[in-house]
Amino acid sequence: MKLYLAAFLGAVATPGAFAHQIHGILLVNGTETPEWKYVRDVAWEGAYEPEKYPNTEFFKTPPQTDINNPNITCGRNAFDSASKTETADILAGSEVGFRVSWDGNGKYGVFWHPGPGQIYLSRAPNDDLEDYRGDGDWFKIATGAAVSNTEWLLWNKHDFNFTIPKTTPPGKYLMRIEQFMPSTVEYSQWYVNCAHVNIIGPGGGTPTGFARFPGTYTVDDPGIKVPLNQIVNSGELPQDQLRLLEYKPPGPALWTG
């Protein structure tokens, strides 16, 4: 445990660490849309240093570490870009996704941290996305967890693809991606972004199981703070002792329509 804790805290404390990412690209039926066209842009972390990092996107990649901070909703100061974010028309029942637009190594990066991803929807009051901070109710429509006892679905992948439930009530929503690395300590890194989407379809479903961000998660929730056998890169357990398939993600149950 001491070995894992030291490695974990050392990695997260390293300035300019490469293991960060942002998801500024929305995928619609497998088609890439322009970066930050439909996803709320986020602010830099700290001071921009053009002599060291000429691309400003690098400074958008650091995670949220306080799950009680309003930035956990859609990313760092994301509401500031709401008025210039366009809204994508999405057919209920179709496949959509988020693509990692930048990581520590450059454009079109990957999900660096071994851990799950989840997708939530929140209907904008009066279908007004420009004035909606995301402080209402969210329901979960997708989880990308483990595919085996030793491998996470998203780790080192470029995209997180999922399907909008067929009976989702039509209207304008914030669509939120979260990806994070569970740990054995009460500390986690969160990579969150939100897209503007207009869901078109027959409706008929009634979403259930709501969450709020911030508000629903705590640092010691199961799924955020986990046992050592659900940590891929601890260095303390052999592969055959890992049990990722026993992992239960935080938040409400999936709503599938």
UniProtKB/Swiss-Prot annotation:
Its cofactor is Cu(2+). It holds the Pfam family AA9. O2 binds at residue 189. The keyword Flavoprotein does not apply. Binds 1 copper ion per subunit. It is an enzyme of class 1 (oxidoreductase). It catalyses: [(1->4)-beta-D-glucosyl]n+m + reduced acceptor + O2 = 4-dehydro-beta-D-glucosyl-[(1->4)-beta-D-glucosyl]n-1 + [(1->4)-beta-D-glucosyl]m + acceptor + H2O. Disulfide bonds join 74-194. Its EC number is 1.14.99.56. GO terms for biological process: cellulose catabolic process. Cu(2+) binds at residues 20, 113, 191. It comes from the Eukaryota. Its main location: secreted. One of its GO terms (molecular function) is monooxygenase activity. The keyword Cytoplasm does not apply. Lignocellulose is the most abundant polymeric composite on Earth and is a recalcitrant but promising renewable substrate for industrial biotechnology applications. Together with cellobiose dehydrogenases (CDHs) an enzymatic system capable of oxidative cellulose cleavage is formed, which increases the efficiency of cellulases and put LPMOs at focus of biofuel research. Residues 1-19 form the signal peptide. Glycans are attached at residues 29, 71, 161. GO terms for cellular component: extracellular region. It is found in: Secreted. Keywords: Carbohydrate metabolism, Cellulose degradation, Copper, Disulfide bond, Glycoprotein, Metal-binding, Monooxygenase, Oxidoreductase, Polysaccharide degradation, Secreted, Signal. Belongs to the polysaccharide monooxygenase AA9 family. PANTHER family: ENDO-BETA-1,4-GLUCANASE D (PTHR33353:SF10), PUTATIVE (AFU_ORTHOLOGUE AFUA_1G12560)-RELATED (PTHR33353). Lytic polysaccharide monooxygenase (LPMO) that depolymerizes crystalline and amorphous polysaccharides via the oxidation of scissile alpha- or beta-(1-4)-glycosidic bonds, yielding C1 and C4 oxidation products. Catalysis by LPMOs requires the reduction of the active-site copper from Cu(II) to Cu(I) by a reducing agent and H(2)O(2) or O(2) as a cosubstrate. Shows no activity on wheat arabinoxylan, konjac glucomannan, acetylated spruce galactoglucomannan, or cellopentaose. This is AA9 family lytic polysaccharide monooxygenase U. The lineage of its organism: Eukaryota, Fungi, Dikarya, Ascomycota, Pezizomycotina.
